[in-house]
Amino acid sequence: MQLHGSGRINSQGHLEIGGVDTCSLVDKYGSPLFVYDEGLIRDQCRRFHKVLSKSGLDYHISYASKAFICKELVRIMKEEDMGLDVVSVGELYNALSVDFDSQKIHLHGNNKTEHEIGYALESNIGCFVVDSLAEVERIDRIGGQMGKRAKALLRVTPGVEAHTHEFITTGNTDSKFGLNIDNGQAREGVEAILRAENIDLIGLHFHIGSQIFGTEGSQAAIKKVFVWLKDLKEDLNFEAKILNIGGGFGIRYTDEDVSYPIEDALEEIITCLKESARSQGLAIPQLWLEPGRSIVGEAGYTLYRVGTIKEIPGIRTYVSIDGGMSDHIRTALYGAKYEVALANRMNEEDASLVTIAGKCCESGDLIAKDVRIPEAKIGDILVVACTGAYHYSMASNYNLMQRPAVVFVRDGKDKIVIKRESLEDLIKNQV
């Protein structure tokens, strides 16, 4: 298993994160347990700022809350001078509950409800990322009723293929997100917002997908958008003050993922942005980014207790754990692959070929298939790396499983940031 950030093996042969023995964390908080390396989260934010602050560009970085959000993480984002990209009234409420600056929040979503729009306007968020023609009418009407004026980015789909999983590709022609440039819908969107009485169009947004290595797709999208922006300036006298290119920076889950440094990606994007603006005779807009997975993904680990070990001679050995697809859905949903280890026996030889099985009542509840670990014993602590993004945020109560606790660690100290759900929590809304 490749360790990230402060991850190391201590003198007892245990996995240690943030100066804290992970086995002691399981003893203290139980399992399953999510553990986040707070120092690594902060370091990732600073890597983005370091490159962009030297670029000569005006820029803004918004953390993509859908990857993982909780009050403590919002506080950290505030301290690291990050904005927030939220996609629901729940994420917005979470951010506002710790007095995050609403002007540094923007609201996404392909089907924003009237309640969400009204709540966002009342909260004075920085801007809406408009996703459809119907939404233009909705925001304009509700804004007029409330006496509020909204700022908006229009989300466009540039028709660029991202080489990633089908379910997390968002910038191609057939997408539920945004308005298409090629078929004229995006232009209709621009015209509709410019006509609106209660909306100011301040820029454009696109996002071609997630878990992307390299910048070929992003550069192609930037170039295409700038050609289109030149047409908009000539025909509609519209100039985008902001270009938000989303996120999607990939992380390393296994050796199959080819690492692509954030610094290299950002330098290439910045160069492309400047050259594209220059070639079209346009001013360089403010650059907005929305990293999520690349901020928290490698900082997160999930710890489980090993339970039943079942050998099917000549076929497979199943090592079952006390969690599963209720807290780790990405393997079942995407076929995602992960590295695993025994956190209490990190120095031992990976001699056994096994499949890690979750405890949910589904044959497809597998965490990792045909992986090597030391010969497992009941009570061992299994660790899955790189579970910081799209794990707790996608967790469910399937089989009425309790969602795990979440702990942040840093400088030898641990802090509970989300409590484990109780049995009472599972039924408190039932009548």
Positions of PLM-derived features:
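Short acidic, glycine/serine/threonine-rich loops at helix termini
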Residues: 74, 97, 117-122, 139-142, ...
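A charged N-terminal "starter" segment
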Residues: 1-151, 187, 191, 195-200, ...
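Active-site loop/helix belt of alpha/beta enzymes
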Residues: 3-4, 159-308, 373, 410
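Conserved active-site and cofactor/substrate-binding residues in soluble primary-metabolism enzymes
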Residues: 20, 36-43, 68, 134, ...
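The start of beta-strands in P-loop NTPase/AAA+ ATPase cores
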Residues: 83, 126, 150, 202, ...
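Short beta-strand segments
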Residues: 64, 151-157, 205-207, 244-246, ...
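Active-site-proximal loop/turn and secondary-structure-junction residues that shape catalytic pockets
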Residues: 67-69, 90-91, 111-113, 132-134, ...
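Charged (often Lys/Glu-rich) extended helix/loop segments that serve as interaction or gating elements
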Residues: 268, 274-277, 282-431
